[in-house]
Amino acid sequence: MTDLLKRLAAAPGVYRGRGDGLESGPFVARIKVTSVVRGNAITLDYEAVSDSKGLQHVEHTILTASEAGRLELHVTCLELPGVTRFVQSEPGVFNAYEGALPAKIIVTMPSDGVLTYGWWWSRDDAEPREQSRAEVRRTG
C-alpha cells in the first residue's frame, strides 16, 4: 500500500503540465514534490493557473503512512476549511475521511517522471465524479 509513497520519495522535483476541469476549464499545473523525513512523507505543493482565471488553485498536501500502514493525504487548499484527511482505499485512490461533500483524490504515476492528480467530488449525495485532473511531467 505504500508503493506510491516510495515512488514519489525517489522522484522529487518540480512537475509541470496541463489539466482540465468541469468548472475550471483548461489550466497549467505545477506540482512540487518534496521528500521529507527520510522519505517517510512527501509534500505536494500544487498550483493551477489559467490565462482567463489567473491563479485558481493552491494546495499543500502531505502524503504519509498512518500508524496502521495505510497511506493518507492531509490536504489544505483554498477550497477547503482547514486540513482534510483523505485515506487510501485502493492504490492511488484517497477518500475523504470526513467532510460535507463526498470527495476523493486520485494520484497515479503511470510511468517514471509522470504524475496525474485528480480531484473528484459531488455537490450532493451522488457518487463523486472527476472534476479536475492534471497530468504533469518532472522538469526539474
Predicted regions and their residues:
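Tryptophan-anchored aromatic micro-motifs
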Residues: 9-23
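Short beta-strand segments that buttress and anchor functional surface loops
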Residues: 16-20, 44-50, 73-76, 93-99, ...
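N-terminal leader/targeting helix
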Residues: 19-52
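Short, surface-exposed coil-to-beta transition loops
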Residues: 26-30, 55-60, 80-83, 100-104, ...
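Helix-adjacent hinge/juxtasegments
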Residues: 49-85
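Short aromatic loop motif centered on NTY/YTY
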Residues: 80-116, 122
